[in-house]
Swiss-Prot record:
GO terms for molecular function: transmembrane transporter activity. This is Probable transporter MCH1. CDD domains: MFS_Mch1p_like. Pfam families: MFS_1. It is found in: Vacuole membrane. GO terms for cellular component: fungal-type vacuole membrane. Probable transporter. Keywords: Membrane, Transmembrane, Transmembrane helix, Transport, Vacuole.
Length: 486
């Protein structure tokens, strides 16, 4: 019989149902809730823009130095993700939680001290403290790494806490419900919302930003939350190990190590659908990252007559709101409609809608017609699609390759996203700079008009359409034939 990895209710209704089903203990629900709490607190790194310029004003940093601090955090978070995932898969996610428990509070505490010392130096001398920028960059590198460790540890604990183990055809099988994956992912998206509101209410007064206070707050927060996640991971892994042993002992099970929870790394990297799906994620995630990072530049190209220019802050809020809403809506709906609409089909439809919008942007209907009145449509669709992809893709990854090497595999997808973000970001910059030299505003670095971004959106729209078709093809002609249900 083919390994179908179907939902457990489908498995247990068959005549040849498994002889024993090992369901999570009641404590599993508590671990799941604590995992949600972990990712709901993990996205402090995304708030850098709220205090980044204060480093320039109060510490005398150049813009290059400010950017170096921000880039260091991204390097720690994205580039180390596959390594962090591999270490978690091999040695246990509790070690990653322990690492974040140590480095998160320590890095933020040290950063607070550096800020206070550098601020005093700048007030007295009018110059930047020479060692402040590299030291701050090093702190934020570890903050980025701690973010990935905490995120992955929470995700793996959630997966273990809700997974069901059963023996079928002499082999141990695992079923992980979709909400055990998209739940923590959606919570991570919500994290920056409540944290940003708290910072505005407590640490920001007008243009005055209490950066040292912000750093100390996060140091205290993570000293508590990371400790909770550490003990949750230990409990989750212990419970999962016990359930596996009971399922193995319940029948004549020919189990050969951790592969029964999903694909081995060799199986993943030799699976041609893995590389195709990675490529699809580059073409899906890259355009949304590009739009998010260059939204201000796009809005600056819009020329309006007798009207106010579109508000950048309004569109940032729209993007964030619909990104968050989509994580919840798509997460719940994909779970509820699992037996009717598969997640790859849902991802294809969302990518196709986004492709249509991107291909319509060069026409000027959203940016030129009626003083850019309908530009919000572009923002909403990109925000919704961005959040949806971060809900659907990790769930699909789990359904296809299991949770045995979830950290390494999902880390590879995060790395693919970084490649897409970099590639499409460079594309936007090249098109923008080329247009500014020949179009309106050619005497300055500022570009105005559709030609500043038209070619970029044609390419992103085409890439999204290709990815939508490719995901649908992979699902219908490859995954479905393997008997994978999602």
């Amino acid at each position: 019989m083919v390994d179908e990895r179907t939902p457990l209710k489908a498995v247990t209704t068959r005549e040849d149902a498994p002889t024993a089903v090992m369901r999570p203990k009641p404590v599993g629900k508590s671990i799941f809730a604590l995992s949600i709490l972990g990712t709901l607190s993990a996205a402090s790194i995304s708030l850098f823009s709220m205090y980044g310029q204060t480093l320039q004003h109060k510490l005398g940093f150049t813009q290059v130095q400010v950017n170096s601090v921000s880039i260091s955090s991204l390097l720690g978070m994205y580039l180390l993700m596959p390594v962090i995932g591999y270490l978690g898969d091999t040695y246990g996610s509790n070690y990653l939680a322990l690492f974040s428990w140590i480095t998160f509070p320590a890095s933020y505490s040290i950063a607070s001290g550096i800020f206070s010392t550098a601020a005093d130096w700048h007030r007295e001398t009018g110059e930047a403290l020479p060692r402040a920028a590299p030291e701050m960059a090093l702190c934020f590198f570890f903050i980025g790494a701690s973010t990935s460790c905490m995120y992955y540890a929470s995700l793996k604990a959630s997966a273990h806490s809700m997974s069901v183990y059963f023996a079928e055809d002499g082999k141990l099988q695992t079923y992980t419900p979709g909400y055990a994956i998209w739940g923590p992912v959606a919570a991570f998206g919500l994290s920056s919302l409540w944290q940003s509101q708290l910072l505005r209410a407590v640490f920001i007064t007008g243009k005055n930003v209490n950066v040292a206070g912000i750093f100390l707050f996060f140091a205290g927060l993570y000293a508590v939350i990371c400790g909770i996640i550490f003990f949750s991971c230990r409990t989750a892994e212990s419970m999962a190990s016990e359930l596996r042993k009971k399922a193995e002992a319940s029948t004549d099970c020919n189990c050969d190590g951790p592969g029964h929870e999903g694909a081995t790394l060799k199986e993943f990297f030799t699976d041609k659908t893995a590389w195709l799906f990675l490529l699809c994620f580059v073409f899906i995630g890259g355009p949304f990252e590009m739009f998010q990072n260059n939204m201000g530049a796009i809005l600056d190209t819009v020329t309006v007559e007798n009207a106010d220019s579109p508000s950048f802050s309004t569109h940032v809020s729209l993007f964030a709101t619909f990104s968050t809403v989509s994580r919840l809506v798509v997460g719940f709906s994909s779970e509820a409609m699992e037996s009717h609409v598969s997640r790859p089909v849902l991802l294809s439809v969302i990518a196709l809608v986004a492709a249509c919008i991107h291909l319509m942007v060069p026409s000027g209907i959203f940016t030129v017609f009626d003083n850019a009145k309908y530009f919000s449509v572009v923002t909403i669709v990109n925000g919704f699609s961005y959040g949806s992809s971060f809900t659907l893709v990790p769930t699909i990854v789990t359904k296809v390759w299991g949770i045995a090497n979830l950290g390494t595999i999902w880390g590879s997808f995060i790395l693919a996203l970084a490649v897409g973000s970099l590639g499409y970001g460079l594309l936007f910059a090249k098109v923008y700079d080329a247009a500014s030299e020949v179009g309106v505003g050619s005497m300055s670095q500022v570009c105005s008009g559709v030609h500043c971004y038209g070619l970029t959106f044609v390419i992103t729209g085409t890439g999204l359409a290709f990815a939508a078709a490719a995901v649908f093809f992979i699902w219908v002609f490859m995954w479905k034939k393997r008997g994978i249900h999602m």
